[in-house]
UniProtKB/Swiss-Prot annotation:
Contains 4 disulfide bonds. It comes from Lycosa singoriensis. Residues 1-20 form the signal peptide. Keywords: Disulfide bond, Secreted, Signal, Toxin. It comes from the Eukaryota. InterPro entries: Spider_toxin_CSTX_knottin. This is U11-lycotoxin-Ls1a.
Amino acid sequence: MKLIILTGLVLFAIVSLIEAEEESGRACILLYGECTKASGSCCSNLICDCYRKLKKGVQIARQCFCLEKDVVYKKHI
């Protein structure tokens, strides 16, 4: 009985370590990188900011980019 419990604990520890390694190995998205499909993947000092692409007032697309936190971008005409 002790052997079964010990084996289960060892397997649980191995699976936990593998999952933790996979999560820490993921690369974050750098400044101005597209994060449309992965909104939580920007590097720690960045935020995923999304914009609607309009054509004649109708939304045709949505694009997201990793941008600096607390920075406002304005369009110059």
